[in-house]
């Protein structure tokens, strides 16, 4: 019975999600994010089966959610308006902040001589565990149309791996940790921290770590300070920085729900400082509740 109910719930929203995708994409195009909108359109329509509202998700049992992919999606905002002026000026508490990626691209050098670097499409290798959820923070709206968004706490990072067309796999910690952005409701821009993909206690295959393990490769103690080996011996866990822009597409003044699209660029894993990071561009949807 639980499985049948879950299937019915998913089937009931298949017609609703494409409408939501169209509305969000049109809004993104309006604010000059045509490239992100094109990627979002394809991804959202293709993955529309599990879209549910916040109340519908809260009403599901564990067995209905298990194995369905619903846990990796953000709630749908079906009611409300695209007229952002309906959102009254003031300071709000941001709750149930959710970010659902729909596209991952990696900046790569051109294969042609003299070509420019560009973001290339990737194949997602991670299971459905990359959505950020249950985050909290603050949201401010000014009478002049200005807006501020800050993220404070929650499930704000997720280990993710993608594969490039050539087969190379790129690991990164998808996050918007401590995001602090300002702008307008059409585009709230800011920076965030990107913690190290691995912690200081992680040991590499030769037993070297940041806070534990060997100081150098045990077979080469005399060459521990050699330049070509130093970056492998000295482990760096310093947090890096990323940037993101959030665009509000729809608000519901009655329930306090808000939703839109986002785009972020962040560095990939550096193997504890042993290799330079790659730029990862993530686009997708976001949802939150204003209190």
Swiss-Prot record:
Which Pfam families does its entry note? Answer: MSP (PF01716)
What GO molecular function terms would the record report? oxygen evolving activity
Name of the protein: Oxygen-evolving enhancer protein 1, chloroplastic
Could you tell me where this protein is found in the cell? Plastid, Chloroplast thylakoid membrane
The UniProt similarity line reads: Belongs to the PsbO family.
Taxonomic lineage is: Eukaryota, Viridiplantae, Chlorophyta, core chlorophytes, Chlorophyceae
- Tell me the residues of the organelle transit peptide: 1-52
Question: Per UniProt, which keywords does this protein have?
Answer: Chloroplast, Manganese, Membrane, Photosynthesis, Photosystem II, Plastid, Thylakoid, Transit peptide
Which gene is transcribed and translated to give this protein? PSBO
Q: Which domain of life is it from?
A: Eukaryota
Quick one: a GO biological-process term for this protein? photosystem II stabilization
| Cellular component terms (Gene Ontology) | chloroplast thylakoid membrane; photosystem II oxygen evolving complex
Main function? Stabilizes the manganese cluster which is the primary site of water splitting.
């Amino acid at each position: 019975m639980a499985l049948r109910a879950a299937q019915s719930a998913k089937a009931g929203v298949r017609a609703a999600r494409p409408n939501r995708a169209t509305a969000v994409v049109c809004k993104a195009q309006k604010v000059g994010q045509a490239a992100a909108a094109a990627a979002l359109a394809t991804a959202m329509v293709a993955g529309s089966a599990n879209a549910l509202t916040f109340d519908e998700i809260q009403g599901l049992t564990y067995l209905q959610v298990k194995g369905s992919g619903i846990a990796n999606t953000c709630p749908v905002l079906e009611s409300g308006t695209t007229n952002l002026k309906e959102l009254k000026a003031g300071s709000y508490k941001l709750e149930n902040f959710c970010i659902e990626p729909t596209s991952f691209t990696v900046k790569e050098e051109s294969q042609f001589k003299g070509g420019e670097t560009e973001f290339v499409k990737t194949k997602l290798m991670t299971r459905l565990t990359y959505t950020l959820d249950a985050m909290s923070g603050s949201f401010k709206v000014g009478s002049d149309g200005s807006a501020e968004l800050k993220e404070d706490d929650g499930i704000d990072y997720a280990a993710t791996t993608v594969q490039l067309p050539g087969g190379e796999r790129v690991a990164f910690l998808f996050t918007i940790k401590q995001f602090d952005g300002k702008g307008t409701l059409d585009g709230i821009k800011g920076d965030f921290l990107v913690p190290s993909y691995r912690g200081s206690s992680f040991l590499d295959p030769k037993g070297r770590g940041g806070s534990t393990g060997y100081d150098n490769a045990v077979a080469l103690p005399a060459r521990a300070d050699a330049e070509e080996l130093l970056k492998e011996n000295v482990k760096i866990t310093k947090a890096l920085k990323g940037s993101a822009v959030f665009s509000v597409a729809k608000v519901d003044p009655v329930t306090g729900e808000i939703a839109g699209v986002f785009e972020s660029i962040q560095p990939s894993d550096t193997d504890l400082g042993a290799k330079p990071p790659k730029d990862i561009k993530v686009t997708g949807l976001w949802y939150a509740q204003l209190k």
